[in-house]
């Protein structure tokens, strides 16, 4: 379990780094209201999906607040990773993060391959620099493994193919709120008939027949914030001590410090 907790913490820290760097009736009504607010907050970005051409983001403006300097057009950050427990005591995590600067209309990031260990051993992590031009991923580092090289160059972010209109039908989810952070979470059991579930099974060769859990997490103000983030996870894990999930986030932050 320990390495799964470390993985969750690691992902949260990574997202923050990427985001900053580049029982009664009355209670049920309150929870339902907050659930709807969480869904509407996610809709700010999810309604943009699928973004088949990521360069379209150069012409889209997100939520602006006082953190933005005058004249700063901002930066979009898109992130997708796939985590899977392939061996006992190990967790493999692969994905990509890309920062799209609207000021310079340039996109740079990296592909990462990380292995976490249960026994306290430090993670093995490899990063490969990339850039995007004409909606095409260009590998900047030398990669001798042809299979990995092709995987990087042909990589598609979740947001490029995901049509999430089906999410609107989900209701009465499991809601968790921490007003001190603030942070908000809601979970729904998805259907194997959902198109996005079928798409993920095909792309990542997910063989388990278990219906996945949709997890929506928000750090920061529900109305929007340049210091918070929204994370979406579709979790196919079969057991508590295993991991099989796809994580995605899209954020809009100041590009100028």
From Swiss-Prot:
Compartments in which it is found: Cell membrane
Lipid anchor positions (S-diacylglycerol cysteine): 23
Family the UniProt entry places it in: Belongs to the staphylococcal tandem lipoprotein family.
Signal peptide coordinates: 1-22
Lipidation (N-palmitoyl cysteine): 23
Membrane topology, from the record: Lipid-anchor
UniProt-recorded name of the protein: Uncharacterized lipoprotein SAUSA300_0410
Alphabetized UniProt keyword annotations: Cell membrane, Lipoprotein, Membrane, Palmitate, Signal
Lineage: Bacteria, Bacillati, Bacillota, Bacilli, Bacillales
Pfam family, one: DUF576
Major subcellular site: membrane
A GO term from the CC aspect: plasma membrane
Record NCBIfam families: SA_tandem_lipo
């Amino acid at each position: 379990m320990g390495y799964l907790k470390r993985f969750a913490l690691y992902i949260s820290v990574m997202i923050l780094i990427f985001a900053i760097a580049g029982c009664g009736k009355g209670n049920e009504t309150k929870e339902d209201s907050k659930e709807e607010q969480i869904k509407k907050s996610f809709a700010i970005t999810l309604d943009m999906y699928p973004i088949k051409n990521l360069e379209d983001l150069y012409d889209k403006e997100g939520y602006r607040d006082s953190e933005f300097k005058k004249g700063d057009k901002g930066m979009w950050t898109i992130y997708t990773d796939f985590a899977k427990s392939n061996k006992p005591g190990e967790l493999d995590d692969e994905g990509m993060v890309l920062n799209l600067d609207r000021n310079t209309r340039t996109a740079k990031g990296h592909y990462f391959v990380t292995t976490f260990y249960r026994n306290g051993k430090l993670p093995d992590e490899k990063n490969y620099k990339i850039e995007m031009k004409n909606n095409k991923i260009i590998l900047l580092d030398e990669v001798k493994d042809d299979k990995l090289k092709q995987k990087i160059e042909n990589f598609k972010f979740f947001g490029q193919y995901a049509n999430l209109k089906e999410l609107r039908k989900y209701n009465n989810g499991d809601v968790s709120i921490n007003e001190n952070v603030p942070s908000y979470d809601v979970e729904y059991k998805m259907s194997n008939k959902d198109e996005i579930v079928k798409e993920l099974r095909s792309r990542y060769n997910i063989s388990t027949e278990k219906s996945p859990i949709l997890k929506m997490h928000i750090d920061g103000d529900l109305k929007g914030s340049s210091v918070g983030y929204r994370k979406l996870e579709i979790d196919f894990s079969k057991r508590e001590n295993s991991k099989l999930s796809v994580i995605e986030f899209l954020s809009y932050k100041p590009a100028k410090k």
